[in-house]
Amino acid sequence: IVPGVVLLNYVCAAVRREAGEGVHCSGFPSVKFLAPLQPGVAFAIALDFGAGGRVRFVCKTEDRTIAQGSMQIETAAGVEQ
């Protein structure tokens, strides 16, 4: 089973690809792991950027949601707008 921290690392990497390399993940106020992910199974990450540096995310395999939650992002200058 892929550890939850590895999934969250993938979520952070997806956010950096979308928002830019100067952004970093500063916290996860809410995370729910709903199903295990087996190594080698493909999954997709959907992101929804909100106000105040809050990003909602959903991780899904072909047939189920495996994790969802929200994270806080910041730049070197502070919270993302």
Stretches found by the model and what they are:
Residues 2, 28-30, 57:
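Aromatic-residue detector
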Residues 7, 17-18, 26-27, 64, ...:
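Generic ordered-secondary-structure signal
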Residues 11-46:
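Hydrophobic beta-strand-centered segment that forms part of the acyl-chain substrate-binding groove
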Residues 39, 48-81:
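HotDog/MaoC-like acyl-thioester-processing domains
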